[in-house]
Amino acid sequence: MLEVEVESDNKHLVADELIALQSIYPEIHLDGNNYGRLNIPVNTESDYFLSFKSPDESTLTDTIVVRHFPDLVMEFFLPEAYPFNSPPTFFLKSSWLPLKQKRVLTSSLIKLWNEIHDCVLFDAIEHVRSIATIAFHLPTEMVFPGGFDDLKKEILAFDKNAKLLEFQIRKFQCNVCFDEFNGTDCFQLTRCGHVSCQSCLRDYYTMCIQEGMFSQIKCIDLDCGKDAPVLTLKELESIVGVQLTNRYKELEEKRRYENDSNIIFCPRSFCQGPSKRDPGQKLAICQKCDFAFCSFCQATWHGDLSPCKLEGDSKKLVEMYLNYQENEPEKALELEKRYGKRIIDRLVEQVKNDEEAEKWVLLNGQRCPTCDRVVERIDGCCHMNCLCGTHFCFLCGAYLMEQNPYKHFNDPVSSCYGMLFASAAEKQRFSENWT
């Protein structure tokens, strides 16, 4: 009869203990009166440096720094003789805690019961929770053998998520607008840790992208200063979204290409893709749309043997070529490759002939201001009447009134005053002084 009463008292004590645990730890899982399971958070106040070896364990491949580890699962089984005559059976489950530490910790829990021979579950749980804050006495620097990449990923992901949850429940003052926000409305930069509200960062970085101020896409806190590195693409996307980030990548890539003298852009207006060319080579192929074109004239590819079609002012081209010949011979050779040396030589000769002809016209003739026809005066006065019907001055080329063409020569203010019958020599002197 006595044994039955003792067994009944034990059950009541265990039931009361489990009810108390349920109220203290609502997240605990209990199964009947003899089994329980509880996740113990492992959030430390110190940084832990975890190094991982290569598969052959010859080198260290990576080192991570964390403060949060995946939960330790604490299970207990209560025998019938508990709490006075038999201790609980404890099982500690963890993907990262070494087996040696698990055994030491389990032994310490049994020792707690040995000291009192009574209900010990609360003390056991609190003991585990207290030393969890120091990662169960593990050193702050640990080395894992090869083959633990999955564990590294698990710890990193857990630590990142735990830090995010901590961040979201805190309050922060934005260093731009100085208002206070919940962490859920803020963003913390990875490199420096500075925090600003999402609205201010989004507005600022959007403006930087739209205005092409790519070097300013970095931390805006004054402590970081002008030498702060630009944001990572992942951070930028978290703030301004995918569309603007893609636009930034396109513009930044184009700017980088524009600074490369060997990069030219597709002449198709709808493409504008980059193409890398070898110096001196005509053929260029767009990396975006595969369009083949001439790197010199931007026209559809016309072959190495066909010269580029000459467009624009040939005189400017000749001036450029002659200047290159004197100062930058390699650029003169590039023009010869583009248009062909014979064509360039012919243009040089033509421009020189045109200049000589223009000099003769300047000294010996005059162009009609209406039709540009060259008029030569053999004899007579300086009042010219062109075939197109225009009256003009042979000396200065000015229009003359048909009703009174000689007023121009009788006006004291006119540059041609008194020179109605100027000689050829006087015409040359006039041209040298007034043109």
Swiss-Prot record:
Catalytically driven reaction(s): [E2 ubiquitin-conjugating enzyme]-S-ubiquitinyl-L-cysteine + [acceptor protein]-L-lysine = [E2 ubiquitin-conjugating enzyme]-L-cysteine + [acceptor protein]-N(6)-ubiquitinyl-L-lysine
Family: Belongs to the RBR family. RNF14 subfamily.
GO molecular function: ubiquitin conjugating enzyme binding; ubiquitin protein ligase activity; zinc ion binding
Protein name, UniProt field: E3 ubiquitin-protein ligase itt1
Binding residue positions for Zn(2+) 2: C192, H194, C219, C224
Domain remarks: Members of the RBR family are atypical E3 ligases. They interact with the E2 conjugating enzyme UBE2L3 and function like HECT-type E3 enzymes: they bind E2s via the first RING domain, but require an obligate trans-thiolation step during the ubiquitin transfer, requiring a conserved cysteine residue in the second RING domain.
Function: E3 ubiquitin-protein ligase involved in the rescue of stalled ribosomes by promoting ubiquitination and degradation of proteins on stalled ribosomes. Specifically required to resolve RNA-protein cross-links caused by reactive aldehydes, which trigger translation stress by stalling ribosomes: acts by catalying 'Lys-6'-linked ubiquitination of RNA-protein cross-links, leading to their degradation.
